[in-house]
């Protein structure tokens, strides 16, 4: 896998995300796809973001923070109802929702209510919090949204399918461990989807770290089929013509009683400097 240079405070600002986009634009091969749009694609890529160096929001275009935060909170409710999002002014799932708003057993359902053969359910998020608090050295701190038995019932199969947490021990007496998260994304729409996914899982890592009394470490994004849609070529060229700004800083205003009690207003993104938004069609 190709890992671009990390952004460091003592170096000129160079965004891993834009390097990723350049790599796919230069080396991608044409592939047909499910939507009939066509893509320029590479297989396998990785980016590593040190969350202590800022919150990794894309700055070469405006990212819709409200949608990122509300979607993550929606996942954590365990809901499959798009109406929850629409009531909060978020429309990113509208293209896939059924008439009544249902999306089938998508991300939140699998995270919170993975079905078991005996008719029960597993709350994977609660298990993660419990394990991080009681056995942080475990190599099994994993959440999967890729439930093969349920795929045909989903309005959209999971693109970001599987993530794992890792705790690096404290380096000094009385210090805190550092929580890192690695996401595997089987299908990555680089222009529209990946900026959301990076922001969402970076935010989740901060939330889980706060709940488990840990410091944040790295967020590692790993992609499978990484692609630029053919009808995003002009938008990509425009975005790559822009110079990135420094990352903003995330401030979480309070510590709720549980991972499920955060509200939208709990999060503040300080000094988010960005270029103008760039519109592009969604491949459905």
Curated annotation (Swiss-Prot):
Pathway the protein contributes to: Pyrimidine metabolism; dTTP biosynthesis
Keyword Cytoplasm recorded: yes
Superkingdom per UniProt: Bacteria
GO molecular function terms listed in the Swiss-Prot or TrEMBL record: thymidylate synthase activity
Regions annotated as coiled coil: none
Binding site for (6R)-5,10-methylene-5,6,7,8-tetrahydrofolate: 64, 189, 283
Protein name according to UniProt: Thymidylate synthase
GO biological process terms held by the UniProt record: dTMP biosynthetic process; dTTP biosynthetic process; methylation
Primary location: cytoplasm
PANTHER family according to UniProt: THYMIDYLATE SYNTHASE 1
UniProt keyword Cytoplasm, yes or no: yes
Catalytic activity: dUMP + (6R)-5,10-methylene-5,6,7,8-tetrahydrofolate = 7,8-dihydrofolate + dTMP
UniProt family annotation: Belongs to the thymidylate synthase family. Bacterial-type ThyA subfamily.
Record-linked Pfam families: Thymidylat_synt
Alphabetized SUPFAM superfamilies for the sequence: Thymidylate synthase/dCMP hydroxymethylase (SSF55831)
Record-listed dUMP binding positions: 34, 139-140, 186-189, 197, 227-229
Residue positions of the active site: 159
Keywords: Cytoplasm, Methyltransferase, Nucleotide biosynthesis, Transferase
Assembly description: Homodimer.
Gene Ontology CC annotation, any one: cytosol
Gene3D superfamilies per UniProt: Thymidylate synthase/dCMP hydroxymethylase domain
InterPro entries, A to Z: Thymidate_synth/dCMP_Mease, Thymidate_synth/dCMP_Mease_dom, Thymidate_synth/dCMP_Mease_sf, Thymidylate_synthase, Thymidylate_synthase_AS
Its job: Catalyzes the reductive methylation of 2'-deoxyuridine-5'-monophosphate (dUMP) to 2'-deoxythymidine-5'-monophosphate (dTMP) while utilizing 5,10-methylenetetrahydrofolate (mTHF) as the methyl donor and reductant in the reaction, yielding dihydrofolate (DHF) as a by-product. This enzymatic reaction provides an intracellular de novo source of dTMP, an essential precursor for DNA biosynthesis.
Documented EC number(s): 2.1.1.45
Compartments, record wording: Cytoplasm
